[in-house]
Amino acid sequence: MACRTFSHHFGRVSGCQLQGDVFLNVSRKSSSVQRALSTLTFLPPAICSRIRGVTVPTISAPILDIEERFEAFENLMPFRVQNILLVSSLYDSFILREDGRLNELLIDESLEMNLRQIPNITHVSSCAEALELAKSNPQFNLIVTNLAVGDMNAAQLARDVRRAGLDVPVVVLGYDYREIKDFVARNPTTDIDRVFLWQGTARILIAIVKYVEDKRNVLHDTRAMGVPVLLVVEDNIRYYSSFLPVIYTELIKQSRRVIQEGINVAHKLVRMQARPKILLSSNFEEAAELVQQYREYIFGVVSDVEFPWEGKLSPEAGFELARMVRSLTPDVPVVLQTSRTEFRPRAQAQGYSFLRKRSPTLLKDLRRILTDQFGFGDFVFRMPDQGEVGRAKDLTELEEMLQTVPAGMKA
C-alpha cells in the first residue's frame, strides 16, 4: 500500500492505493478532519463517491448542504483589517512605501489572499496624533507604529489606546534589532499585540495583517467550519519576522490553486475565507493552551527548541510541546528549529523534522518542509519504496489520477 499524508485546505488525510482502488482515507479520528473534507472544499461528486469515511462525517456541528456551506463560507473571517494607521517618521514612511513598494504589494497580495478588499493606509508622524485620530475615527482596524515617534513611544501609545477603550490591535515594527531588544527590555509590552523587525521587504506588513486577522478570527472560524490551524512557536523577533512571511507566501501559492478550482467566481471568493490560520506563540504556557484549545484543528507545528517556560528559557520546552502535540494528534508533523545542532539527533529520533536556525538555507529548508510534510504542495502518490507514481495539483487532476494510478500494490 502506498500512502502519503497531506493537509492542503482540506485537513490532514492520507492517499492510499489498495487492491486497485485508490481512495482517500482519514488518517486520524478527529472530527475536524472529516468536517474539513466534507464542508470546506466543495469536492466534486465523482471524487466524493470514492472518499471513504468522509461522506457521512461524525461531527458535533450540523451537516450543511451546498447552499448552507456557501453561506457559512461568507461568514468566515468576521474581522478584517480594512484601514491601517501607520505611525512613523516621514523618512521611515518613505522607505516603507518606496523601497518596499508597499501599495503595489498590498494590492497584489490582497487580491491573491481574499479578493475582497485592499487595506487603506493612513500615515501620521507622531504617536500623539495617532491617538487622537484613532479616538475620533473608529474606522481603523490596526495601528502599526515605530518604536518611538514624536514625544511618545509605542508602549505608551498602546497603553493609551487601551485606556481609551479602543479595541484596535497595536503592532510595533522596528528597523534595528538592537533598538528593539532595548525597547522590549525597558518598556512593558502587555498592551502591544506583537513586535516585528523590518528586514528589507514590505512583505512583513502583509504578514502582520494576516497575523492580526488570524488571531482575531481563529476561534470563530474553527468553530464555524473547522478551518485548520498551523501553530508557530518562536520567541526570537528576528526569526519569526523572517519566516512568518515565508509561511504566508506558501499559503498564498496554495490559495491560488484553490481559487482555480472554484465552481464559479462567487465560490472562488468565499473559498478563500477558509485558508489555514497561523497562530504565533512565544512561551510554553501560551503554546500549550493553544494546543489544547485547537487540538482538533492543528495540522502542523513549527517550534523553537528553547523558549520561555515558567518565565525562564528552557531547552526542554520545544520537546515537551512536541510530545504534548503528538500525544493528542499522533500524525501531526512537527518541526523543531534551533541553532544548537546537538539537538538534531534527539529530534530526528523522536520523529520530528529539524531545522538549523543559522543555516544560510533556513528559509529554503522551511519552504521544502512546508511543501513536503505540511501538504502545501501537490498530492503525490508513492510506492512503498517512495517512488512517485502520480501527482495531482488540484481536485480535477486528483479525480483523473484515481483512474490511472497503478494497481497491484500490496499493503
Identify the residue ranges that each predicted region occupies:
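Structural motif
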Residues: 87-91, 145-149, 173-176, 199, ...
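Alpha4 helix (beta4-alpha4-beta5 surface) of REC/receiver domains from two-component response regulators
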Residues: 152-156, 160-164, 172-196, 202-206, ...
